[in-house]
């Protein structure tokens, strides 16, 4: 029974961690209107996120091996939520750039490899 709830918790954390950075893409026109930015600036935000995410994929495995993957999943969800809160209340494009850079770190470098490692460790040998 605990296995089921742990899987639900991990799936929820992963959904939150990956929804928040992509909200700019999902609600593109609303995002541009709300923050009074241009299409190019919105593209810049996703570029900052994308570059950081690509680098994060390369070092994320090392991070997941070096630190406790369960704690990485938890902390990545907390930090992504805090960064999302800053984005929600920010009116500065510079702050948005910093937060989208941080999203790349929290979602890929900290979360993705740790998430995969936690899922692997939860399963039995015959479930691999």
Where do the language-model regions lie?
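Membrane-interface helix caps of multi-pass secondary transporters
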Residues: 23-36, 119
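Paired small-residue
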Residues: 83, 94-102
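Cytoplasmic helix-loop-helix junction between adjacent transmembrane helices
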Residues: 101-128
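C-terminal ends and interior cores of transmembrane alpha-helices
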Residues: 78-92
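Pair of pore-lining "gating" transmembrane helices in MFS-fold secondary transporters
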Residues: 2-27
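Residue-level signature of mid-helix packing/kink "hotspots" within the transmembrane helices
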Residues: 22, 49-58
């Amino acid at each position: 029974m605990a296995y089921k709830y742990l899987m639900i918790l991990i799936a929820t954390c992963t959904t939150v961690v990956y929804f928040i950075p992509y909200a700019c893409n999902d609600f593109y026109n609303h995002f541009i209107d709300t923050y009074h930015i241009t299409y190019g600036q919105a593209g810049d935000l996703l570029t900052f996120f994308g570059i950081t995410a690509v680098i994060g994929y390369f070092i994320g495995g090392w991070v997941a091996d070096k630190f406790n993957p369960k704690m990485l999943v938890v902390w990545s969800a907390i930090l992504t939520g805090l960064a999302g809160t800053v984005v929600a209340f920010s009116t500065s494009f510079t702050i948005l750039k910093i937060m989208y850079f941080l999203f790349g770190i929290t979602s890929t470098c900290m979360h993705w490899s740790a998430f995969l490692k936690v899922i692997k460790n939860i399963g039995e040998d015959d479930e691999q």
